[in-house]
């Protein structure tokens, strides 16, 4: 499957996204039984110019995008670049987002037969998580009571779920005094600690990841009926997540 957060920003630089459902004949090297997705980002197809875009949404969501295209230079070279900054508090408590994304594309038409393309994309990101399931009554006693067969004793007075927390409840974070200077574990190309995302809170579960991808394409038009396409690519990555070590009891 595709984690779209690892490709964040590439849609802002794409010419088109082609979707093919099921197994069928495609002109790609790696067809799939479930289907094929082809993201086209041709720098030579863009006119010269740039744009700045901002998107806002619920939960303090803010996404800022900066894009520039050189257009075709001397009928041979074209460059394209995109930088994205995305932040947000999240819909569920403690599920904030702190992310960047980048895209660089270049195309060089050497002659009538040979064309080269170089691309690099990535999206270093950091998220607060809501990982564990809870009893339905934790979120809504009314909903829990409407379910046939639900044990009412799970939320009677004095029991664990006496007070519902609401749909936005997340047990994987808690507020802390900002004077607390404890740091968060971090593994991004090596283990270390880093400042917490927010000095007023502490996340038990946090995810951080960066999966860059670089590929070099070569297209050789052998004749009017034959083309050779070659791709050399590298895909790296580093990241992980925080969590409770050992056992937790109450």
Task: Describe the role of every protein-language-model region.
Residues 19-20, 48-51, 86-89, 99, ...:
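Extracytoplasmic loops and strand-loop junctions of Gram-negative outer membrane beta-barrel proteins
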């Amino acid at each position: 499957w595709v984690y779209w957060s690892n490709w964040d920003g590439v849609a802002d630089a794409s010419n088109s996204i082609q979707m093919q459902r099921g197994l069928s004949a495609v002109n790609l090297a790696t067809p799939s039984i479930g289907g094929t997705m082809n993201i086209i980002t041709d720098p030579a197809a863009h006119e010269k110019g740039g744009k700045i875009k901002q998107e806002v949404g619920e939960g303090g969501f803010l996404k800022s995008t900066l894009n520039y295209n050189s257009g075709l230079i001397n009928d041979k070279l074209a460059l394209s670049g995109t930088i994205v900054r995305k932040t947000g508090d999240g819909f569920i408590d403690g599920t904030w987002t702190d992310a960047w994304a980048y895209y660089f594309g270049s195309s060089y038409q050497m002659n009538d037969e040979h064309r080269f393309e170089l691309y690099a994309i990535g999206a270093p990101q950091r998220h607060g998580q809501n990982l564990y399931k809870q009893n339905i009554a934790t979120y809504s006693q009314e909903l829990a009571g409407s379910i046939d067969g639900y044990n009412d004793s799970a939320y009677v007075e004095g029991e664990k779920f006496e007070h519902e927390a609401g749909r936005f409840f997340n047990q994987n974070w808690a507020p802390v005094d900002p004077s607390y200077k404890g740091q968060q574990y971090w593994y991004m190309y090596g283990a270390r600690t880093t400042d917490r995302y927010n000095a007023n809170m502490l996340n038990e579960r946090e995810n951080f990841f960066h999966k860059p991808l670089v590929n070099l394409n070569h297209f050789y038009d052998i004749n009017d009926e034959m083309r050779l396409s070659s791709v050399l690519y590298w895909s790296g990555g580093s990241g992980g997540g925080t969590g409770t070590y050992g056992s937790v009891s109450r």
